[in-house]
Design a protein with these regions (language model features):
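Periplasm-facing N-terminal accessory domains of Gram-negative outer-membrane beta-barrel systems
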Residues: 19-124
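Periplasmic N-terminal accessory/gating domains of Gram-negative outer-membrane beta-barrel systems
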Residues: 60, 86, 91-104, 115-234, ...
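Transmembrane beta-barrel strands of outer-membrane/channel proteins
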Residues: 121, 243-249, 290-294, 372-376, ...
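Outer-membrane beta-barrel translocator/receptor signature
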Residues: 203-210, 218-227, 233-327, 350-356, ...
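Solvent-exposed loop/turn elements at secondary-structure boundaries
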Residues: 602-631, 636-817
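Extracytoplasmic gating/loop element in the C-terminal half of outer-membrane beta-barrel translocons
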Residues: 714-720, 907-972
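Gram-negative outer-membrane beta-barrel transporters
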Residues: 763-919
């Protein structure tokens, strides 16, 4: 039945197009009356005065009007006219992104002396008809509030629910961030920052930002933390431009906290250059806006240098590696293999960031407005070669660039963050009762490693041998294509198409919408992808001796750049009714249905599938089944006295979000079916060889530099099938019934404008959330504690002791499966005060208390780390509710802005922002594996009395109780 209803709904909406659901515009609605009766057919025209953009309609049978798809900001001039009545003109109206401005109009009969009346809009904070927890950050605030990092988070912190990238105690990766409706989110989730190095778009190109925590508008979706919607600036009828420069260095920041001085500061600086320009192409009709910004931070990636002839190495800047050896090594590689190592004295270093943006706005006619925007970001940093890691059984004793070893410029690597994004939006009004929004967006985001090196094996030269002939396990020289850089790429492409169709029926505003989002994400990681050689000494290398170790990663079936990919499409269908039950009471009710389907095939590893976990199997060749998830929502706003001085608002509803896509690609990455990892090595004990892989002898003589020749020489497999799969050391899977995270949020708020001589408003808001489908990892390979056969500790701490055979299968270490839990809840309470005690002086202060409980915060980006890093008593599989790792229990924010007009054309702003908070939760854990389950995440037992636990000495007991008594929580 549900499928039939969905089909009919999709069929109905297919007449209007398709769309996704993050807001890009504002709106205006109201009622026109005269002599306490509704005025039918009154003309309402709103003009965005800076651009001359006009929006018009007429009132319906109930005297109501609604204008949608309007530019946010202003000022607007609204004219309301009707034959036989004075024309009412409202000026100075400002619209907020994503909100509908409420304008109720009373017309009076015309007289010969007065043909029209002009009214200047008051600065009520409650003119918008929002229902849930929302914060709007205006263009003025973006210009005046202090910003050190020039990042979006410098402004979203204004939201009382914010704590860095986290909102309401949720993982920052559960947010969604859009610009003009385009997804510029941290979808993959390897790090906590946004694409483009954390700032995918210049602040000087942004016009307004909206932060929504619990919006009861069903058009907003794909988050359980916060939805952050930004819109870019547009051109107007006036040519306006700006040029700017920002500079800071180590002298311009503090270096002392309390009594702690951090000593001499290393040199650092950052300079940002930028410009904006916009204006009319055709007055009142066609506009443009452009922005360019370039950032540069001089860096010194490598501070070590090689020792000159006769020079003594030191522990600060001069390495023991000599210039003569580096020069000889480089020349050999050039002469014998035609490989250029790059300089060993001049290394790439600078951090650069380039941002470009262009936007066109076209007022086709009064009923159709089109906007098109494109932006590009390229952030680039340089790093020294990896310190000491390898894939041959042990790490090097010291870093590859250090007092003991040196490398070359072409062995450094860059981290490059590239963003390309485009949007096209058409807002149409077909009649006074019918309007439509059609939006198309495209975003391509890449985080990739780069290098100046040509493809070539990575080579470690070790320091040789001791006098007794034992190997010195220390690096001496390094050259080649950095071992973790080849085909190291995270890519994410997002395309959305959305359509919102709105029909006005009396006191009802009906919205039907459909959205489709198609995402592709891939994680490519091939350490040793060009081959890896490690030689015991420089002499061994020069003499063509067999390498001490060798490693290689290559793709099966001729794929030179394999990737663990996930592709999915999400169809969203929604219906909403905004019902003005009375002039001062509006009820919003809607339902949203989202269906996510995976679109790419992956190969099963039959060896993994054959493992039996108490009747359950892990299929690494199948994505979760398609799931239809429902998100019903209801919200209301009540203007108690019908004068916008006291509003009560709130609502309740379901919100469906996403998880970092890396937790999906973890499965194919760890299945062993994408690429082959080969390690051929020599093993030691105390420097003495204990074993040596005989295949190393095949690599004597000149190095093999071609990957295909390496594969053929060593007789490695070039293809794979499900039946040829072998068991990896750890297994990663996804529950076939897995659902995207879903939470139920309920909020209630009161907005009050105090009756004083200046604007002074107070907001009280509370919100409760309950997890419907939270996310966790569950290790299938760990047996559940058995109260009948497992032992326990004696005493008050009677946790289980894991037996030696607690693993289901001893030939794998873990089998972590991504699954759901319904456990988890949270609540927040907030009070916000806003005031304008004097002209051009604005003050804001807010206090928020947050509590949030969860089973797992899914820390990191790896399935195993997400499981092992959950504090527990009887093991991560048995973990209970705990305070969220992302929660900030108490937070105070305040800001003050004072604008001083120096003359008619010049003014100065003085702004101050304050943020104070109590630290987030932490846990006390034993340093060892207390219960024997192989994981060092065991919570300590806090005794109630001094007699409950024993100590080996009186000194230990005194130290323990001294520590307990100084902590307010522990001593309870």
């Amino acid at each position: 039945m549900a499928k039939k209803m969905l089909f009919l709904f999709v069929l109905l909406l297919s007449l209007t197009g398709m769309l996704k659901a993050q807001v890009t515009t504002a709106g205006m609605s109201g009622k026109v009356v005269a002599d306490e009766e509704a005025v039918i057919g009154a003309t309402v025209v709103a003009v965005h005065e800076p651009s001359g953009t006009s929006y018009g309609t007429v009132t319906n049978i109930d005297g109501r009007f609604s204008l949608q798809g309007m530019r946010s900001g202003g000022p607007y001039k609204v004219t309301v006219s009707y034959v036989g009545y004075q024309t009412a003109i409202y000026t100075g109206i400002q619209l907020q992104l994503g909100e509908t401005y409420s304008l109720n109009v009373t017309l009076h009969e015309a007289s010969e002396l007065l043909g029209e009346i002009t009214i200047t809009a008051s600065k009520s904070k409650f003119s918008a008809e929002k229902t849930g927890a929302t914060t709007n950050i205006s263009s003025e605030q973006l210009t005046t509030l202090p910003s050190i990092n020039r990042s979006i988070s410098d402004f979203t912190r204004i939201s009382p629910y914010a704590s860095g990238n986290s909102f309401g105690g949720r993982d920052g990766r559960s947010n969604t961030f859009t610009v003009d409706g385009a997804n510029l989110n941290n979808n993959f989730g390897l790090s906590s920052g946004l694409p483009g190095g954390g700032n995918p778009i210049s602040l000087d190109a942004i016009d307004e930002v909206q932060v929504v925590i619990a919006p009861y508008d069903v058009r907003q979706a794909n988050f359980i933390g916060a939805g952050i919607n930004a819109i870019t600036k547009s051109g107007t009828n006036a040519y306006r431009g700006s040029a700017y420069m920002y500079f800071n260095n180590e002298v311009m920041r503090g270096n002392k906290i309390g009594d702690t001085d951090f000593g001499v500061r290393a040199e650092e600086s950052k300079t940002v250059y930028g410009a904006t320009f916009g204006g009319p192409i055709i007055k009142d009709k066609l506009f443009f806006f452009a922005n360019v910004e370039y950032e540069k931070s001089p860096q010194q990636v490598i501070t070590w240098r090689a020792a000159k002839e006769g020079e003594t190495p030191n522990n600060s800047t001069i390495s023991r590696t000599t210039e003569a050896d580096l020069a000889e090594f480089s020349q050999i590689l050039k002469d014998k293999y035609r490989y250029n190592t790059g300089s060993f004295t001049d290394f790439p270093a600078d951090v650069t960031n380039l941002k470009l943006l262009g936007r066109i706005d076209w007022n086709i006619n009064q009923g159709n407005k089109l906007s098109v925007r494109y932006n590009f970001t390229n952030n680039k940093t340089w790093e020294a070669p990896n310190g000491s890691s390898g894939n041959t059984g042990y790490r090097l004793a010291y870093n590859r660039v250090s007092a003991y070893s040196m490398s070359y410029a072409n062995s450094c690597y860059s981290l490059q963050n590239i963003v390309n994004s485009a949007t096209a939006e058409l807002n149409s009004r077909f009649s006074s009762n019918v309007s439509n929004q059609l939006l198309f967006t495209y975003s391509d985001m890449k985080d990739e490693r780069g290098t100046n090196s040509s493809p070539f094996p990575f080579i470690d030269i070790m320091a040789g041998y001791y006098e007794n002939g034992n190997q010195i396990l220390e690096p001496y020289m390094t050259a080649g294509y950095e071992l973790f850089t080849y085909n190291n790429l995270v890519k994410n492409t997002v395309m959305t198409i959305v359509d919102n169709f709105t029909y006005y029926l009396g006191a009802h505003k009906l919205t039907a919408g459909i959205s489709y989002e198609r995402q592709k994400a891939g994680n490519s990681y091939m350490r040793n992808g060009t081959g890896y050689y490690r030689y015991s000494s420089f002499e061994d290398f020069k003499n063509g001796a067999a390498p001490e170790s060798f490693a290689l990663a290559y793709g099966y079936n001729g794929n030179t750049k394999p990737s663990a990919d996930v592709k999915f499409g999400q169809l969203g269908v929604y219906l909403q009714d905004e019902w003005n039950i009375r002039d001062n009471f509006k009820l919003t009710a809607g339902i949203r249905m989202d269906n996510l389907s995976f679109l790419n095939d992956i190969m099963r590893n039959q060896a993994i599938y054959d493992l039996d976990f108490n009747g359950m199997h892990i299929d690494t060749g199948a994505w979760p089944d398609s799931k239809l998830q429902f998100s019903p929502r209801v919200g209301f706003t009540w203007d108690v006295f019908n004068d916008k001085t006291l509003k009560v608002r709130g609502g309740s509803g379901f919100f469906t979000g996403r998880i970092p896509l890396v937790f999906f690609t973890n499965m194919p990455t760890n299945s062993g079916m994408i690429q082959n990892l080969v390690s051929i090595t020599t093993r030691y004990k105390d420097g003495v060889v204990t074993s040596r892989d005989p295949r190393l002898e095949l690599l004597k003589g000149n190095m093999i530099t071609d990957v295909n020749q390496m594969i053929s020489t060593l007789g490695l497999p070039t293809s794979i099938s499900p039946e040829e799969g072998v068991l990896p050391s750890s297994v990663v899977g996804i529950d076939p019934d897995f659902k995207m995270p879903q939470v139920w949020k309920t909020s209630l708020a009161l907005d009050y404008q105090l009756p004083v001589s200046f604007p002074l408003t107070v907001t009280l808001e509370g919100m409760f959330s309950k997890d419907i489908n939270a996310v966790r990892q569950y290790n299938y390979n760990v047996q559940a504690p058995d109260k009948d056969t497992w032992s326990r500790f004696n005493g008050p701490d009677d946790r289980y002791i894991y037996p030696e055979n607690f693993l289901q299968h001893t030939n794998i270490s873990s089998a972590n499966v991504l699954t759901n839990t319904s456990k988890g809840w949270g609540w927040t309470g907030n009070i916000t005060v806003m005031a304008e005690p004097a002209k051009n002086v604005n003050i804001m202060a807010a206090y928020t208390h947050t509590e949030s409980k969860e089973i797992s915060g899914m820390p990191g980006s790896d399935a195993n780390s997400a499981w092992t890093n959950v504090p527990s008593i009887n093991g991560p599989n048995s973990s209970g509710l705990m305070r969220s790792q992302y929660v900030t229990p108490n937070r105070v924010v305040a800001s003050i802005n004072w604008r001083v007009h120096l003359n008619k054309k010049t003014s100065s702003n003085f702004s101050l922002f304050y943020s104070g908070y109590s630290s987030s939760g932490y846990s006390f854990m034993y340093s060892n594996d207390m219960n024997g389950n192989g994981v060092t995440n065991d919570l300590i037992y806090i005794p109630k009395t001094k007699d409950e636990i024993k100590f080996t000495s009186t000194e230990d007991a005194d130290a323990f109780w001294k520590f307990v008594n100084q902590d307010p929580y522990l001593k309870k």
